[in-house]
């Protein structure tokens, strides 16, 4: 989908952890009239494991996916990561089997590529400065949206 055209967000500190800045965020990314992208992030959940969640959901016209980010549950011990796919022509969810986890593998590949590129061992970088710039542009837009406080009633 790329970079959204706008964002609505509220980001807050947790009252019992005043030494930290914003650790709870709700954001809606505007990709136009046919895409719904809502984020709910809470780094201060302290009510036990029963309803704790660290997940990503994709609900699309041609299928769906559900991802459990297990490391974020009981960090740093964590739980197993899971990926479930509901295919376009499917009638039930299918569990994707894989080895490893998203962390630290998600960072190892990018960082080792950067190190190999700097030594001349890789011809190109897997990621770009432009991508990082667009990510930070989105983060800053979330801060601005939160400061503006939304549409007044």
Locations of regions flagged by a protein language model:
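C-terminal helix-rich "cap/oligomerization" subdomain common to oxidoreductases
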Residues: 32, 113-153
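Active-site loop of classical SDR/Rossmann-like NAD(P)-dependent oxidoreductases
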Residues: 99-112, 127
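Contiguous beta-strand/loop segments that form the cofactor/metal-binding neighborhood of enzyme cores
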Residues: 1-75, 110-121
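Short, hydrophobic secondary-structure boundary micro-motifs
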Residues: 7-9, 68, 96, 125-128, ...
């Amino acid at each position: 989908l790329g970079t959204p055209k706008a964002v609505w967000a509220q980001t807050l500190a947790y009252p019992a952890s005043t030494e930290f800045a914003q650790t709870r965020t709700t954001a809606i990314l505007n990709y136009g009239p046919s895409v719904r992208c809502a984020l709910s992030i809470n780094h201060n959940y302290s009510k036990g494991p029963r309803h704790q969640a660290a997940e990503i959901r994709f609900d699309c016209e041609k299928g769906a996916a559900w991802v459990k980010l297990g490391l974020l549950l009981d960090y740093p011990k964590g739980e197993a990561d899971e990926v479930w796919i509901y295919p376009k022509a499917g009638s039930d969810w299918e569990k994707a089997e894989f080895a490893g986890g998203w962390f630290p593998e998600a960072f190892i590949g990018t960082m080792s590529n950067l190190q190999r590129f700097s030594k001349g061992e890789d011809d190109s970088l897997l990621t770009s400065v432009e991508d990082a710039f667009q990510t930070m542009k989105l983060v800053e837009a979330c801060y601005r949206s939160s400061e503006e406080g939304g549409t007044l009633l």
